[in-house]
């Protein structure tokens, strides 16, 4: 326990703290340098780094690194430290954050819906953990982030849906802020670019892929979680496990209360909040 505490404290000061004081470009260079120094401990080293302009969105850039034998793309330079130990390790970190092992127990889902998949690390880890899974669907509407997830998952069988999830199928206004992973239907703080994206309901996604239960859903809709759950009616009994990030992304207000209410309406039980923003639930089907 003492070693773990020392390691965590050292990690915070060496890797995480500098992000608060350095501009993005210098922080990236710093982490690339640090990864070389600690590679003998973690067996990880950022071998190459490049920064790529995004077509149609010249104000944004994509970062690309080579760690070991794998290449990873991501949209925020301040997140580079997440990938020092590889893409699967980053996915496992997210898996733990969403308490997936806790809600699954010894069960194995028939399919996984990753709603708000970002650059795909959660889906990627799921594909490793459950190699025989019938389908994993990664849903992501942000066109900048999509370039990353398409690259990161290109060697997998994971299906990528370039849409948003809402309470209706329509073309809707969407506010783009990929560098902080805050792109949303709800205007985020700071500068954001207004675009239009295709939105679909969870019902329509489940039906498109002919998913059968039991389904595991991981959801992070940047404040749009209640509307996403509204679009789940015909197929709600196919979903057995769900884990939702209900953080304060809706004008600074958490959606936890609305999320719990919707889950109860859909017949979920064992609804549990973890920390400030993770809500998990299980349904007997």
Residue ranges and their predicted role:
Residues 1-139, 147-148, 255-259, 266-285:
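S-adenosyl-L-methionine
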Residues 109-110, 127, 132-137, 156-158, ...:
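Conserved acidic-Pro-Pro-aromatic motif
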